[in-house]
């Protein structure tokens, strides 16, 4: 089982990177023990909530194996996990932004997938012999990406920055889902459909990165980390069709542990 040993070794290294910078990592004296734990607020959608990685704890699909929970645990941070499945940028504005307090030390934001309609597009494209309809659905999402998306994302990230001016703000992107293969009898994604969806994810990440730069935030891009671990790969970090259906095509436990945690966690270095 060498591949699993390598995975475990990678996980240990990733968590060591995060844990090495924990505010209390050197706590050996009463003075250190009395220090206030640093705070971390995680905003966003189902990817940030951890849906698809282990059993969800609530209706928002929050999981103890999502990268916010893992980073907070290893880094000994006080976590406010406000992320919720189905959230759009408007939802983060209206329902999650208040979770960010002025004294927050770290804030991550992962949102945008629902704004471009990834869930309905995936359901549409999963139907057999449906390339034209799939392409139309993807085109609709890309039209928004090329239209109001940049302004809306910049406004949201700017609002988060205004809530906690001293916090380290990290915008988080999305992984490549497909590798050109279709390995399930339950769905049928053609090579053309997979290419369209992957291309839209790449464009989404570009837009998120640009919006992050505009407000002085960091951008954590998981694309390279997930390379070789798309659905239907030898060791996938992304679910295929699963129950509940809403957890399909989300990072699994390995994706959160070995993909997202080191990619996002490195920005917690002081």
Predicted region positions:
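A structural motif corresponding to the C-terminal end of an alpha-helix
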Residues: 73-77, 152-168, 203-220
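Short amphipathic alpha-helices and their capping/turn segments at secondary-structure boundaries
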Residues: 24-39, 92-109, 153-168, 264-268
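Structural recognition of the beta-strand scaffold that forms the well-ordered cores
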Residues: 39-44, 48-50, 78-83, 105-110, ...
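Serine-esterase "nucleophile elbow" of acetyl-processing enzymes
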Residues: 30-83, 97-98
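Oxyanion-hole/transition-state-stabilizing segment in secreted/luminal serine hydrolases
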Residues: 91-145
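Secretory targeting and sorting signals
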Residues: 1-29
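Catalytic His-Asp segment of secreted/periplasmic serine-dependent ester chemistry enzymes
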Residues: 175-270
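Acidic/histidine-rich helix-loop elements
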Residues: 51-63, 122-130, 248
């Amino acid at each position: 089982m060498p591949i699993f040993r390598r995975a475990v070794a990678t996980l240990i290294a990733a968590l060591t990177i995060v844990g090495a910078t924990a505010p209390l990592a050197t706590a050996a004296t009463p003075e250190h023990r009395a220090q206030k734990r640093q705070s971390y607020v995680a905003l966003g959608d189902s990817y940030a909530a951890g849906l698809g990685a282990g059993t969800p704890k609530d209706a928002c699909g929050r999981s103890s194996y999502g990268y916010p929970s893992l980073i907070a645990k290893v880094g000994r941070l006080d976590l406010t996990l406000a992320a919720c499945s189905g959230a759009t940028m408007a939802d983060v504005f209206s329902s999650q932004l208040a979770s960010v307090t002025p004294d927050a030390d770290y804030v991550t934001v992962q949102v945008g997938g629902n704004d471009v309609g990834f869930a309905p597009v995936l359901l549409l494209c999963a139907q057999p012999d449906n390339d034209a309809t799939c392409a139309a659905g993807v085109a609709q999402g890309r039209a928004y990406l090329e239209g109001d998306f940049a302004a809306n994302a910049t406004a949201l990230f700017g609002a988060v920055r205004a809530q906690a001016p001293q916090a380290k703000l990290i915008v988080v992107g999305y992984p490549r889902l497909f590798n050109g293969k279709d390995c399930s009898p339950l769905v049928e994604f053609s090579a053309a459909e997979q290419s369209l969806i992957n291309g839209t994810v790449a464009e989404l990440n570009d837009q998120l990165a640009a919006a992050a730069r505009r407000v002085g935030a960091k951008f954590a891009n998981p694309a390279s980390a997930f390379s070789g671990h798309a659905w239907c790969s030898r060791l996938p970090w992304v679910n295929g069709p699963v129950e509940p259906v809403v957890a399909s095509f989300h990072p699994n436990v390995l994706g959160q542990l070995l993909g997202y945690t080191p990619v996002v966690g490195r920005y917690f270095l002081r």
